[in-house]
Each structure stands twice: as structure tokens, then as C-alpha cells.
Amino acid sequence: SENEIKTQDIKLRNLPAYFGVDRALACLEALKIIKNPFQKNLLIADFGTTLSLTKLTAKGSIIGGQIIPGFLTQLKSMEDYTQNLSSPRNYKIPFQNFVINTEESMLRGVFNSLTGIINLSFDPAQDILIICGGDSELVGNRLKQKNDEIIISPNLVMKGMISHYNG
């Protein structure tokens, strides 16, 4: 339709044509909300069906990214591809790393897989991390407790869409 946003409509440096519109809009908005006084790179972690990581230089050029199964996707795959595991009914992630209860073990394992990739990819000395997406608060609040270089902005993509239309 005439109001459809296409990747090529978004003005970002080094933006590949195949890049998802949602990721591009998140980048666009992240560059607006960050006042980059230390000229740090920007790492955007969009926690949804997938966890998409996108890294930009301090000047706003896309370096690249990673895409991994998201929180619910990992839980659902355990339920679908194993015989005796069911997705937990609540998502209260235990603070202990090793737990006896199966549902809590699944939650802790998925949480550790997602935060582990963040910890491997995010260097607070060189990066500012912006966390967005539907599961951003579930995971982001635990990460933020450890670092000031983290911004949680759950609706980053939607805000990017609004910014794009308001031009």
C-alpha cells in the first residue's frame, strides 16, 4: 500500500536492502533517543519472537547483527521437540542459576541463553545497549541492574515508525 514502509525508504548508513523494516526503524529511533556524548557504538537488542541484535557505529552506520530464537520461541521449541517438557504457565524467572523444578529450569535456561548472548556482545566501555520489544522488560530489568549503559525502550520500533512518518 502507499503507506507501507520499505527498508529502502529508511535513511541509515550501510543499510542492506534485505534488512528487516522493524530492525531499521529501531535503529532510526535509537539514534534519535541517544545523546551519544562519549561517541560509543550502539547495540540494539529487540526481544520478541526472535532476539535480534543490531550494532551501529557511533556515527550511525550499521555494522551488522545476529538473530536468535526469542524467549517464548525457545520455550515453545522445547515443548514441541521433546517428549516431557511443557511451556511454563508463568514466566517468573528464578534468581538461582540451578533449580530443581523443571519449569523453573526451562525459564532459567532460556533467560541465561538470551542474557549470555547480550553479555558476549555488549561491552559497556564501547557500547550503549538499547533494549526493546515485547519481552524487553522481562529480560531488560535484570540486565539493567548491572549497568548504567543500558536503556530500556519497549516501543522503540513503533516510535521509529512514528518518527519516520513525521519525517
Language-model region placement:
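Nucleotide/phosphate-binding catalytic cleft detector across ATP-hydrolyzing
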Residues: S1-L42, K59-G167
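Gly/Ser/Thr-rich loops at beta-strand to alpha-helix junctions
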Residues: T49-S52, S136-E137
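Short beta-strand scaffold segments in enzyme catalytic cores
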Residues: I44, L51-L56
